[in-house]
Each structure stands twice: as structure tokens, then as C-alpha cells.
């Protein structure tokens, strides 16, 4: 990417590992002053390299003990209505990831739920209010064990 050098790449890698690292500590790692690091981070934010900062939060804090992966086969994967229909889903606190992808299933939604009943309620609402006339079929998987999980942005 234009305007990015090796020092910027190190800064981004370090922030991915620990977004709470101090500017002084980060400066030590890249051989710059805290002020110079701050300027580089602001540049990376303006360029869109750094889109935000997140915390890895245990979903059980919110009473959500069940993680589900919902795959959706769309009737028309290129439907112009898709972005508008997905907008409210993207804003739901318990939905952490929504992807449009290649393959048999076109959408993947990952979310956390209190229990199977709340997952079922979400699925009924999803089909009735959002995916009516758009989805051919869905496939739901329950996560049994988590080995690695990225942070979830808190808004």
C-alpha cells in the first residue's frame, strides 16, 4: 500500500497483538519517539489501514453461552436488496461476523445466544423479517469449542 513502510507494518502488527500498548513502548520497539508513533498511527487511521480498536470480550458476560454459525444459501446472491436487508443484522450486539462468500452458501453469520431457544427465536425472526424471498436454505452449526477468536468491536 502506498505511503506505508516497514515501520508502519511493525506498528500495525504490534497493535493487532495488543491495542492497549503504550505509545512509548511501541516507540521502543520501532526506534521512534512516542510522538512520532502517534503521528504514524493517525496516518494509518486516515488511510483506513486501522479501522478501529476492539476488545476480546467473553460472551458469557452478556449471558450468552452458545455460539452459532449460520450459513445461508441465497436465491440471488447479487440481489440489490441485500445490503439494506443486512443493515439491521449488522447492528445487533450479539452478531459478531457477517460475511458474503463464494461456495454453496453465500452468507455466513456468527453470533452468540443465551441458549437454543434464543437462537431459534433469532432464526425465525431472521427468516420472517429479513430473508423472506431471499434465502433458499440455511444451515446452522453450534460451536462446541473455541480455540482462537478475534476481538469484537464494542460500540
UniProtKB/Swiss-Prot annotation:
The keyword Cell wall biogenesis/degradation does not apply. GO terms for biological process: response to amino acid. Residues 23-42 bind DNA. Signal peptide: none annotated. It comes from the Archaea. Keywords: DNA-binding, Transcription, Transcription regulation. GO terms for molecular function: sequence-specific DNA binding. InterPro entries: AsnC-type_HTH_dom, Dimeric_a/b-barrel, Tscrpt_reg_AsnC-like, Tscrpt_reg_AsnC/Lrp_C, Tscrpt_reg_HTH_AsnC-type_CS, WH-like_DNA-bd_sf, WH_DNA-bd_sf. PANTHER family: LEUCINE-RESPONSIVE REGULATORY PROTEIN, TRANSCRIPTIONAL REGULATOR, ASNC FAMILY. This is Uncharacterized HTH-type transcriptional regulator PH0045. It comes from Pyrococcus horikoshii (strain ATCC 700860 / DSM 12428 / JCM 9974 / NBRC 100139 / OT-3).
